[in-house]
Amino acid sequence: FAVTAGSGASHPHVQAVQQLLSIPEPDVDFAAAKVTIDRLIDPHIDAEVTLRRIDEIAAEIRALVTFRSTTQQRAAALRSYLYDAGPWNKGQTFSYDFNDPLGRHLPNKLLANYLRTRKGNCVSMPFLYIALAQKLGLTVGAATSPRHVFVKLRDDHGTWHNIETVSGGWP
């Protein structure tokens, strides 16, 4: 959004982005931030429904591990929930959308669409992983390379691992 003096700083989209940018990074709810940005692209996205579904998935993953689980155990449960068919996900995994391998179809980058279709790309897949990982208390972030996004996960020893969500969430 190009904003010049007096041109649109009060526009709701600009205000939404300014509000996100005013939050200290450690306090950012990644899921809420991503859905806020997604709504700038598609205002028909129901943020409440999308965020509720992310919270439900996080709760389902939490139920797969003990209260005192390690980072590795929580990350393994997250990976398994998303990419392994089982009773925890009713046999419905999340997978790469080979019909849009370069991610040119913009709706495929939106979390609401990924949650609905379970077909994603190198934007929606790592961003859902990050949103869920944050809710599971994992230290994660996004890393980029040309035309690609992957996840950085810090383990209990402070070592960072690259997680490739488009190929089953393996380091």
Identify the function of each model-found stretch:
Residues 3-171:
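A structural boundary/capping signal
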